[in-house]
Amino acid sequence: MDEDVLTTLKILIIGESGVGKSSLLLRFTDDTFDPELAATIGVDFKVKTISVDGNKAKLAIWDTAGQERFRTLTPSYYRGAQGVILVYDVTRRDTFVKLDNWLNELETYCTRNDIVNMLVGNKIDKENREVDRNEGLKFARKHSMLFIEASAKTCDGVQCAFEELVEKIIQTPGLWESENQNKGVKLSHREEGQGGGACGGYCSVL
């Protein structure tokens, strides 16, 4: 681990096939967008280091497949994760309806009780919306999740989603602290009075 890196975090991106998980990942890690991106088979894996509130964290981001036939592969992917981004497509209500199934799977396979979950409504650049923002916000509040709407195509909300998730994880020392006890790392604290989250309150911290 780099000396100035506070911790390495395992982040999962889950949700139904076609909601834009891979597009969100590539926009965040490589700042690219491919409208013809093929569905992920199995899992994709990216690493990116970011700085939030003066704390540098290395993210190991796992993009899990949404197809039902790959569900049997997921238990090992959930193991040890500190954060999860659960994605639905705001233009496809069926992907929103199935969020409960993903939460049940997360509860079944996740090895941590204090894992941080972020709900992302993707594809807000499209006009044929089927899921209102307030519906997403209500669902997130019900399940104590962070929430944001985003567009991998236009980049709206993408950086914020990851930064807000990482900020919340860092604020939950039990998620990562034990792995760094012998490394002499220190958490940098935001100056008193500074608030609104990593993105100035753009995300809802619930």
Swiss-Prot record:
Q: Where is this motif: Switch 1?
A: 31-45
Identify the GO cellular component terms for this protein.
apical plasma membrane; cis-Golgi network membrane; cytosol; endomembrane system; endoplasmic reticulum membrane; endoplasmic reticulum tubular network; Golgi apparatus; lipid droplet
UniProt keywords (A-Z) are:
Acetylation, Cell membrane, Developmental protein, Endoplasmic reticulum, Golgi apparatus, GTP-binding, Host-virus interaction, Hydrolase, Lipid droplet, Lipoprotein, Membrane, Methylation, Nucleotide-binding, Palmitate, Phosphoprotein, Prenylation, Protein transport, Transport
User: Which positions anchor the lipid (S-geranylgeranyl cysteine)?
Assistant: C203
PROSITE patterns named among the record's database cross-references: RAB
Summarize tissue expression: Ubiquitous.
- On whether Membrane is a keyword of this UniProt record, the answer is yes
Q: Give the Enzyme Commission number.
A: 3.6.5.2
Segments crossing the lipid bilayer: none
Renumbered to this chain, the signal peptide range is none
Q: Where is this protein localized, as stated in its record?
A: Endoplasmic reticulum membrane; Golgi apparatus, cis-Golgi network membrane; Lipid droplet; Apical cell membrane
Q: Motif Switch 2: which ranges?
A: 63-80
Chemical reaction(s) catalysed: GTP + H2O = GDP + phosphate + H(+)
Q: Where is the lipid attached (S-palmitoyl cysteine)?
A: C199
A Pfam family in this protein?
Ras
Q: Which residues carry this modification: Cysteine methyl ester?
A: C203
Domain of life according to the entry: Eukaryota
Mainly localized where?
A: endoplasmic reticulum
Q: Which cofactor does it need?
A: Mg(2+)
* Chain sites annotated for binding GTP: S17, G20, K21, S22, S23, D34, P35, T40, G66, K123, D125, A152
Indicate the quaternary assembly: Interacts (in GTP-bound form) with ZFYVE1. Interacts with ZW10 and this interaction is enhanced in the presence of ZFYVE1. Interacts with BSCL2.
Name this protein carries in UniProt: Ras-related protein Rab-18
Upper lineage ranks?
Eukaryota, Metazoa, Chordata, Craniata, Vertebrata
